[in-house]
Each structure stands twice: as C-alpha cells, then as structure tokens.
Amino acid sequence: MNLAVIRLFKHHVNNIPNILPHQLATLDYLVRSIIDENKSVLLFHIMGSGKTIIALLFALVASRFKKVYILVPNINILKIFNYSMDVVINLFNADYILENIFIYSTTSFYSINYNDNVINYNGLSRYNNAIFIIDEAHNIFGNNTGELMTVIKNRNKIPFLLLSGSPITNTPITLSNIISLMSDEEINFSDIIIQGKKVFQILLNEHGVNVLKNILKGRISYYEMPDTDLPGIQYHGKSFLDTRVVYCNMSKLQEKDYINVRKMCNNEMFEKNMNNVSLAVLGQLNLINNLDILFQEQDKELYPNLKINNGVLYGEELVTLNISSKFKYFINKIENLKGKHFIYFSNSTYGGLIIKYIMLSNGYSEYNGSQGTYPKLIHGKPKTFAIVTSKMKASLEDLLVTYNSLANDDGSQIMFLFSSNIMSESYTLKEVRNIWFMTIPDTFSQYNQILGRSIRKFSYKDITQPVNVYLLATVYSDFNDTIESLDDYSLEEINTLPFDIKKLLYLKFKTKETNRIYSILESISDSYTQPPHPHIVEIVLGEIVRQFFYHHSRIKQNDERLLTAVKSVLTNTEAAKKYIKEIVDGHFFVSNKVFDKSLLYAYKDEIITVPFKLSHEPFVWGVNFRKEYNVVSSP
C-alpha cells in the first residue's frame, strides 16, 4: 500500500461518490506488483473495506495492457460485480478497454473450459498474457475450479489477484492452496504443521512461520477499516470466553429427542442431524437421514400437538415451542425489539421448514406470501419475514433492494431476513439492528463474514444506537456452566458438553491459531512511500478534484488552492495548469455540498460548479415480439 497516496487526502469526504484513499493506495501497490513485476498478490482486506471496488479499479487499469478474467462464486455475486463496474467506471478518470475484461461465475467458467468433465487443454492458450482476479479465493479449492486455476497457473505462468477477507476457512491447511497459486514454491505441509488428534489441533510450527514469511513477503496487502463511524456491538447472554452466548435450555420434550439423535451420531461435529435438533426437534423425522421424507408425509403426527402434511407443519406446538428452545427465546424476545433483524441458520431444507411455520403461527407474515395467524402489525401493515436460501426462486437482488431501502429502515417492508450460507459473502445489508445466530457457524471466518454483512461503514445513518448480537446455543435443561478459559475442560469432558457448546469451543480453539497466522500476514503486508504510479495518476487526480469541489462552488481560474492540490501529484506547474484546463473544458463531474451533482464550467475568469439533473418526457415502449423486427414507438 502506498502510504504517500493516503497522505494526499486529509479530511476525506466519504458521503459522496468517491474512491477511498486506502483503495487508491492499494491500487498503486497492485499496479506495481502485478503489472510491473508480474507477481501474484493476496488482497487480504477485512470485510467491509471495499475489495470489490479495488479489484474493479485494478481491472480497468490492467485492461489497457492485458486481458483480465474475474471469477466470482455465483450468479448473484456476478450481478453485484457488474453493477459495481458501472459505479467504478463513473469514477475512473483514465483510459480503459472494457472489451478486455471478462467476469464469470465459477460454474460458467468451468463449463467453457471442460469437455465431459475433462479440462480442454487446447483452449487454455486464450489465457496467455492475462491476469486472473478471484473473489472469495478461499472458497475455490477442493473442487474443479481450484484444479483448473492450478493448471492455468502452471501452464500459462500468469499472475493472480486473490481477494479474501478470511483466507483461512477452517485450518492452516487451507492456506496451502492460496500459497500454491501465488508462488512456484512446492510446500510439504507435513513439514510445517503440528498435527493433533482433532481438526482444531492443526498448528503452524516455527518452520512453517518462516516459510510463510519467506514465500508471501511482498505479496500481501492487508487492511482493516478503522472502527470509527460504526455502531457499537451489544453482545447478549452469558459470559463465554471473550464473548457472550445465550443459553437456551431445552424442554424435556426437545431434550429427549435431542439425546436420542446424539447417540446415533458417530462424528457429530459433521452431522447435520445435530444441527437440526439443536434448532428444533420433529419427532421420528429426526431419526431419518433423508430430508425428502419431510415433504412426503401426510397427516403424520410428530407430537400430540404437531403434525406434518405434504411439507406443511401445523399444530399448537408451533406456538408453545417445546420443540425449540432457541425459537422460544427468539419469539419472546423480538416482541420488544425495534428495527430490522438478520438471522443466520444452516441446513436450508430443514431450517427453512421450521422457520416458515413457526413465524406464520406466531403472527408474522411471509413477504409476498402467506399471512401470519392473527398478524402482528407495524404502521398498520403486517410484520413480514423472508427466507434466503440457495434454492430460492425469486431474485435475491430484488429482495435485498427492498430490505435495504430507505422505506425499510424501520423494518416496515421486511423486518426479518433469515439466511443460510448464501448470504455470508459479498452482500451488504443496511440498518440491521439485531443479528441472530440460530446455528453456530462452522468456522471463525464464516462467523465474521456473517457479522460483516451488516456491521460495516456507510450502512447506518445513526451510529449512536448499538447493534444487538444474539449467539444462541441449545443446552440441556440443567446446564448453566460459566466458561472462562479454553482450559476449563479436557478433551474428554468437551465431548460430553451440549453440541452447540462443544462446537463453540472448537470454534474458539481454531480461532486462536487463525488469529496468530493473520497477525503474521499483517506483519508482512507491503507498504511504502512513493509518488503515485504513472498508470494511476489521472485516477488519483480525479479524486483530489472531487474532494476539492465538494467544498468549493466557485473559484478563480488561477486559484492557488486548486493549483496546490493538483501539484501535490503533478509537480510541474504548467502540467498542473494544463490538467485543470482539461477537466474544466471537459466539464468534470463532481458532487458539491451546496449543489450536489454538478459539472465544472469556465465562466469569465472563474471555475463554477453547475448543478444538473437528467430528465425525460414520459414515454411508452411498444414492442412487437415477432422474430423479424421490433417496433419502438413514442407518443
């Protein structure tokens, strides 16, 4: 990161269309490392810091010299990247070749490079002299996409820009995949780790620390946004190590079936069934590993007050909630909470069924769907919920537009957004006041990503109000242990703890090693002080001009303040004056604090900001869908 670029911007205004100083400073680093030196880079910027914008800025710069291929996890994130590209282009003050930039989802990229599940090696030559940008890079390995990237890297000898806010998904071993794409070094991971009996006991040894530093030095950009301009976080529940957890003590009904299912699980840390019964129990259905049975049973009695019929749950138990200590707590608590809720859960088939019918039975209506029993209201309208899973048919983007809209700041359009893992990456939520974990996440990175969807800069108008976080754990009816240290229990004792508590302890064990490695990556992150790279000078100058004219509506053409600002990059006075003339003659777009969206104009001996507004007459499109032609008419 070029610290000299950051120092160009004091009191940077962030509430207008802009490029943040750290994004420009990182762009400088990427240009020097990837374009000039042909090195691969890991962009390890913590969630909410604008990695997508940095990646697209770099893609536009690089497009002048090479083809750029951008891979994203799925079609929904592809849409986000395409939208963000339009935003970035509007702020980009330099030449680019858009035809040299290709954005693919991993599945579509797979389809064009494989024939009958075999890599089409003859087609890989198209990636010669290219640059690859991979979003959420930690997720592409262990599948065909990871294999393909390794082949392309070895055959084509091209650089990669890997984006990740959490490069270690589970254990240090996952870092080996990222290293393999970033260097030509062959690493025997058995030489650099200490392997215990459990997954969380995989540690990086001292030799591993040195290997990590030697291979990745000069290839890491680490950045974490300052926590200013963020609301405080209020964790609820019982003290648990360095956080708080809400203990949800089971009823006798839930506890009985919970124990029966637990006896069936040989390795319960990877058993969906334990996640299921920790969320809610459904009688005999919990003893069957095939969830399709849920939607085939007809008028089957699960408990005296709960039945299922063709995938529909009904009965008084959905209100008394002896089947779920977590939902009993949740339903009782939300009655008195204000604002929007974001609720994470796993196992979308089972969880989605439970959530839908508990919410409907307790008076909450489905967004664009069924109305709740005796509907609860806000401003005279039903309080609604939406469930997001990978199987949802409606557009996720449309749903999020409504959820994030100004009209929904109070939750009057959609109050409760339930989501499985699909929402853990790349999406931004706004004005969320209550975050719930109905399932304990599998990894530390997943936990942080879920929090990071909501608690981020520019997502809250009022940062004086805290965000409530509820991490729910299903526990036995008599369990009330206070856990202060990871050493409070032996491994044998941990195995007897409630599933959620055991999972939390494993998560904390893994977190300890993850944090140690992250601190190593942070320590070798590259920073320097140099004038802006020639390839990004115009982009930096554009941001300097935007910042200047936010504060000034009208100045003399020879204004020394503007000249000084431009000369901070263009040290030659004549070059600076020429640049100022060019942006005025070209009617550079700025956002002024008085006039808002404006264009620069020369008026006599002054430079003025002239507000503008795009408008059009009402019109109607008439389209003939015959194959031969379309007719467009306007009255």
UniProtKB/Swiss-Prot annotation:
Keywords: Activator, ATP-binding, DNA-binding, Helicase, Hydrolase, Nucleotide-binding, Transcription, Transcription regulation, Virion
Residues involved in ATP binding: 45-52
One MF annotation (Gene Ontology) recorded for this entry: helicase activity
EC identifiers of the protein: 3.6.4.-
Sequence ranges assigned to domain Helicase ATP-binding in this UniProt record: 32-185
Subcellular localization: Virion
Gene Ontology CC: virion component
Entry similarity comment: Belongs to the helicase family. VETF subfamily.
Function: Acts with RNA polymerase to initiate transcription from early gene promoters. Is recruited by the RPO-associated protein of 94 kDa (RAP94) to form the early transcription complex, which also contains the core RNA polymerase. ETF heterodimer binds to early gene promoters.
Name by which UniProt lists this protein: Early transcription factor 70 kDa subunit
Lineage: Viruses, Varidnaviria, Bamfordvirae, Nucleocytoviricota, Pokkesviricetes
Gene that produces this protein: VETFS
